[in-house]
Amino acid sequence: MNNNYQGFTEESLCCSFCGKNHLQVLKLITGKSARICNICIHLFNNIVTNIFQEKKIVNYKELEKFPTPHDINQYLSTYVVGQEYVKKTLAVAVYNHYKRLRYQVMNINNNSNLYQDVELSKSNILLIGPTGSGKTLLAQTLARFLDIPFSISDATTLTEAGYVGEDVENVIQKLLQRCDYNIDRAQSGIIYIDEIDKIAKKSENISITRDVSGEGVQQALLKLIEGTVAFIPPKGGRKHPQQEFIQVDTTNILFICGGSFSGLNKIVEERISDNHAIGFHASLKDNNRENLKYSLLNKVEPEDLIKFGLIPEFVGRFPVISILNELKESELVAILKEPKNALIKQYQKLFYTDKVKLEFAESALSAIAKCAMATKSSGARGLRTILENILLDMMYDLPNQNKVTKVVINSDVVFGKSKPLLFYDN
């Protein structure tokens, strides 16, 4: 065998890994400071392949342990009051997402021919509901429960590439951060994008002006949702030509988007009234307006979302649409006291650190719920603001009043008719 190794000593013509010289092997590849023979290349290739297969088997075992829809729903219910249909929808969607991943890994491990030609597509979810109805809380609770990468982003910060704001790839960046830049885990994660209605087109008509936070962002997000290889800057921020990028395949990432879609009910109402001109308007008079708004949203069709300002291709990528209803007074009362981290429990813990017991009469809880319902734009989010206003003076004065042992809040305190009842030591 003539390998043309003129100018090299006998010692330098040996494999750096096994020590065989160039006469004992078929091929010896020489680099700047090391050499490797064809035997070692074949050996190392087998090692890497085995590691990959073992990793797939481990991933499959991890996916086998994934919680059932009942488990997911039960956990959501410990933190989120009401919205039973939405919780069930999310539980099934997340479970099916991981069944889909498990099926893919199972085929790689077992080379099974059963349903081998059947491709399981993603079922991305669109959540529609008023502010304070629990969309973000549901996403945050899911993120805590699932041992998988789960990130939450805000659509209002996203702009087209080249404009002030965040690139759409930042939603993938946040997912990478959640799993310490483990690309394999990120590629099977879940992304929740809040305020998705804020990137609706300003008008159905084509405009000559640039809509940098509307249709352009929808087009850019569409590519990620459909499945593409995204090039992500390693430390976030804008892309620069000289920097290296992390490549993330978004094909298996599940996307959940949420928004209030204010005014969507009117679009649905117009469509239905056009189709049922006689009798429909009469029913408006007979129904409670808030109940009607919720029932209208339950009849939402893709064409309504398109008229609202979402592009058809974007709407088409969300086969699951789930509606969150406005919270009733009884549900707001339950939110105050029942969840694991209920607001009342949080403030009781704060007072407990000052060795003071905080109690709320049932009448006070109902009064707080009534106040929250009066501010229709905030929903459950208004509960904390109301509690802060009620308890502010107490939280300010109590650290200097060592003898106070208990504070009682009733409905008169909530409505500003009296001050909290204080109980003292001895």
Swiss-Prot record:
Q: Which UniProt keywords apply?
A: ATP-binding, Chaperone, Metal-binding, Nucleotide-binding, Zinc
Binding-site residues, ATP: P130, T131, G132, S133, G134, K135, T136, L137
Chain sites annotated for binding Zn(2+): C15, C18, C37, C40
One GO biological process term? proteolysis involved in protein catabolic process
The similarity annotation says:
Belongs to the ClpX chaperone family.
Under the heading HAMAP family, the entry gives:
ClpX
Protein's job:
ATP-dependent specificity component of the Clp protease. It directs the protease to specific substrates. Can perform chaperone functions in the absence of ClpP.
How does it associate, per the subunit comment?
Component of the ClpX-ClpP complex. Forms a hexameric ring that, in the presence of ATP, binds to fourteen ClpP subunits assembled into a disk-like structure with a central cavity, resembling the structure of eukaryotic proteasomes.
Query: What is the protein named?
Result: ATP-dependent Clp protease ATP-binding subunit ClpX
From the UniProt record, report the name of the gene that encodes this protein.
clpX
